[in-house]
Amino acid sequence: APLSSSDYIEFLGEMNDGKPDKALYRDQDFQLNDRYSLETDTAAYFLTVNTAGGNLRYTTAVNTAPSAATPDAYFMRSIDIHYKKILNRGYANRVGEYVYSSAYDPGEGFTFGDIIPSSPMQERFVPLNLYTAGPANGFSVRVNAAGNAENTRNLKINVNGPTGTEIYNVGMPFFTYRKVAINNLPLALLTNTTNVVIAVTNVSGVSTDRLVVASIGITYPSTFNFNNEKKFY
């Protein structure tokens, strides 16, 4: 039925993201953060109204709930945090000082700030609303990171803080990058049903070494409690 004088339309608009930027990189895999555009955050939306009816893109759908349906106890929730603290310049050549190309290079884009060996990065995910009876290996962790100095190092990832369970420790020397996706982790790693801390550590013998993190994400079984959030998935 047409909208009455008391009805309203709730409209959600999102800023432009960085997905179209992928084609600008010399290798599209170099892009570590596609949430934010390097060109513009502007997006345009148009709402049109046809008072005569017969709209092209809107049709009335029947929303009939099935009888005797059993509600799902949980769903697999993904939470991804994309950082925009600094604009990392990516790969560099040392010619007396670091010199950067005009090309879109590995690691170039928005990231968290530089992470040095003495200061691990810690990201707390809260509230989880964990469904503890979910799949036994239903926990996943994702990290996109890159080196930011001409040194050797390992990228180390821990669950439950820097001294918690180590789930990844692999070399990422110089300006190389890693897109880490660790699946089928034990759900028992989530010892706290309300929050979890994912820690990223720069393991290097050079105290001034640097790495950057573009994004951190997790997937886990969650109850249908969204804490009054307006946007979730």
What are these regions (language model features)?
Residues 1-233:
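Structured catalytic cores of large enzymes
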